[in-house]
Amino acid sequence: MAMSELGTRKPSDGTVSHLLNVVESELQAGREKGDPTEKQLQIILEDAPLWQRFKEVTNEMIVTKNGRRMFPVLKISVTGLDPNAMYSLLLDFVPTDSHRWKYVNGEWVPAGKPEVSSHSCVYIHPDSPNFGAHWMKAPISFSKVKLTNKLNGGGQIMLNSLHKYEPQVHIVRVGSAHRMVTNCSFPETQFIAVTAYQNEEITALKIKYNPFAKAFLDAKERNHLRDVPEAISESQHVTYSHLGGWIFSNPDGVCTAGNSNYQYAAPLPLPAPHTHHGCEHYSGLRGHRQAPYPSAYMHRNHSPSVNLIESSSNNLQVFSGPDSWTSLSSTPHASILSVPHTNGPINPGPSPYPCLWTISNGAGGPSGPGPEVHASTPGAFLLGNPAVTSPPSVLSTQAPTSAGVEVLGEPSLTSIAVSTWTAVASHPFAGWGGPGAGGHHSPSSLDG
């Protein structure tokens, strides 16, 4: 069918009638609140109690170069417009006084004359122009307005930092002759424009009532979030592909690198001591405020851990505590590790622990049978050296010389390609008996 034929096709009378009925029902709720004379015009501020709570501690709004949205969001309800007339809604911000403000000793005080403002920015609601019935059918939200401290256009409102403003709504009737119908403002919506929140009470209120905000994290937490991938829920998979080398962080989770196909559906059981290192979400803001966000990372449970960190020589070294943060010496010891060259399976017997270290002849994959390695007593693994000085009772291991090592964890499988495994003494995992069960602070590759 030719394009001209498509362009000239007309909808049937039934289709047109249906569309008109949809429009009519949409505007009917607004018509019921209308007044063709506009004498009963009324504007109500939505969420007035929330605005009042912010005003009691002097509200602050962030202004940035690229623009920042307001919270609380300015939202109003209008009644008494002519349902069949066309109106546009505009928003601007007027200074409330002739001062510049500063925050001193926990309060806002005047600090000199204000900056001269040579610009006047007006925000036009994106639904403008529209019928009065449209404006009256539901609350009107100015959620898309952005506040900036740079004059860059794009519908943003430019404000001077450390000046106090009050939003002002204008209703203009459009048609053959435009005319101002009304303008209104609400004192509880006043705020001081800032580039960073000054009052911690305001910060806490913003976090409490705006759980989607990202601007309220402390600098320490923001730096921490730059070093780790974006927060995910427990039901999602996580992939760390750009961290360079293997990193076993202090918390219960494991961060893997070098292979974007490695995914963990659940954290491996490597609990952490009481330390701020590792993949975790800081639950408090500046030490005492609660954040409304779910925990972004696996939390600590204050128990011992084993840290594996890749050295420059691509050897995997074990750090067990603050007193032993140096490389382990490589000394031959014949009685430590038995490595028979065999392709047959090894049946070491049952183990009560949820995490098993398995060695297979392949290149490391999530499936496939292979000989297993079980630790009968607490221990850790060292990659790269053929033997390490350690008591012979630490680990009983049988494996081929070149193998792929798999970690069987519930509910996921993870693979690590290695050449040789040896054993050294270390602190036990959580829940294992034996000496050295106390937690120690270990270095982490995720230190901020």
UniProtKB/Swiss-Prot annotation:
User: Where does the UniProt annotation locate this protein?
Assistant: Nucleus
DNA-binding region(s) from the entry: 45-218
A GO MF annotation of the entry reads: sequence-specific double-stranded DNA binding
Which Gene Ontology terms describe the biological processes this protein takes part in?
anatomical structure morphogenesis; cell fate specification; heart morphogenesis; mesoderm formation; pituitary gland development; regulation of cell differentiation; regulation of cell population proliferation; regulation of transcription by RNA polymerase II
Keyword annotations for this protein, in alphabetical order, are:
Activator, Disease variant, DNA-binding, Nucleus, Repressor, Transcription, Transcription regulation
Asked if Nucleus is a keyword of the record, the answer is: yes
Q: Record's Pfam families? A: T-box (PF00907)
Its Gene Ontology cellular component terms are:
chromatin; nucleus
Which CDD domains does the record associate with it?
Answer: T-box_TBX19-like
Q: Which PROSITE patterns match?
A: TBOX_1, TBOX_2, TBOX_3
The illness linked here is: ACTH deficiency, isolated: An autosomal recessive disorder that is characterized by adrenal insufficiency symptoms, such as weight loss, lack of appetite (anorexia), weakness, nausea, vomiting and low blood pressure (hypotension). The pituitary hormone ACTH is decreased or absent, and other cortisol and other steroid hormone levels in the blood are abnormally low.
What is this protein for, i.e. what is its function?
Answer: Transcriptional regulator involved in developmental processes. Can activate POMC gene expression and repress the alpha glycoprotein subunit and thyroid-stimulating hormone beta promoters.
UniProt xrefs under PANTHER family? T-BOX PROTEIN-RELATED, T-BOX TRANSCRIPTION FACTOR TBX19
Q: What is the protein name stated in its UniProt record?
A: T-box transcription factor TBX19
